[in-house]
Amino acid sequence: MKGALELQHRVSAHPDSRCWYVAWNPAGTTLATCGGDRAIRIWGKEGDSWECKCVLSDGHQRTVRKVAWSPCGKYLASASFDATTCIWKKTDEDFECLTVLEGHENEVKCVAWAPSGSLLATCSRDKSVWIWEVDEEDEYECLSVVNSHTQDVKHVVWHPTQELLASASYDNKICIYKEEDDDWECRATLEGHESTVWSLTFDPEGRRLASCSDDRTVKIWKESTTGDGSSDESWKCICTLSGFHGRTIYDIAWCRLTGALATACGDDGVRVFSEDPTADPEQPIFALSAHVPKAHNQDVNCVSWNPKEAGLLATCSDNGEFAIWKYNSA
């Protein structure tokens, strides 16, 4: 390993509870965390420490599983086990709950904004993916409900530049969606993992998709042209990283600034992989660049790269804390 992860901060964010997710705002100056205590906490740096700026505790009745900032940074979406998604609007130093999106039958596992900020995707244990549209008056409308998975849907992620959506599920599959005639459809199903697919991340250009799974592998998928003129997407697995993780890989994040790939694992470890720039793009080679075996003393649930500062990585854990690391590639 030629790189290193250096711990910069460790913060008890959700005491006596799991910290499920940590998300940087688009400016890279603020963090949002969520947990089993039903709360969302907003964090800012003061001097050399991270301080809680506000607590959003009145939006959900159960665990908050995921938080996502809008591309403009003025809104925060939260997905909860109470089957709702809350949209929060930033007002000065506080946030107000603007609207509650209802419709899922069970726990909402993930929420994600499209790069345009005008579309939102949610997914749930009810096996469905919902696409929502937001207008200039902050009104949210469900455009489409897609039932392409046969089990709990764990994760949704948008392509960085296109209105293309990917989802990961307990059914071991990944689905790729595009809009067709005002309706959203599954255009490709990616099969290859042997167990639950927990998370997905696109590379900075959106040409490749990385997935992580309960089968302890990371797979890299690349869009390939079908050549038959059909409108369906075709994606193939061009690389599998195996033998690096001791337990389930819960999250994966591709750094937009450096191209480094980070993973969060049930063995309490955080790992960063770097790509060999000399390798064939159709057969990429990723090497383990940095590994902190006990990054947290319980499962690591999330890895999140700062969008503005290269190499700054946030992680969070079942022990209720989040940590900030500095990744140095060499």
Curated annotation (Swiss-Prot):
GO terms for biological process: iron-sulfur cluster assembly; protein maturation. GO terms for cellular component: cytosolic [4Fe-4S] assembly targeting complex. Transmembrane segments: none annotated. Keywords: Repeat, WD repeat. WD repeats lie at residues 14-53, 59-98, 103-142, 148-187, 192-231, 244-283, 295-330. CDD domains: WD40. Gene3D superfamilies: YVTN repeat-like/Quinoprotein amine dehydrogenase. It comes from the Eukaryota. Component of the CIA complex. Key component of the cytosolic iron-sulfur protein assembly (CIA) complex, a multiprotein complex that mediates the incorporation of iron-sulfur cluster into extramitochondrial Fe/S proteins. HAMAP family: ciao1. Belongs to the WD repeat CIA1 family. This is Probable cytosolic iron-sulfur protein assembly protein ciao1. It comes from Danio rerio (Zebrafish). The lineage of its organism: Eukaryota, Metazoa, Chordata, Craniata, Vertebrata. The gene is ciao1.
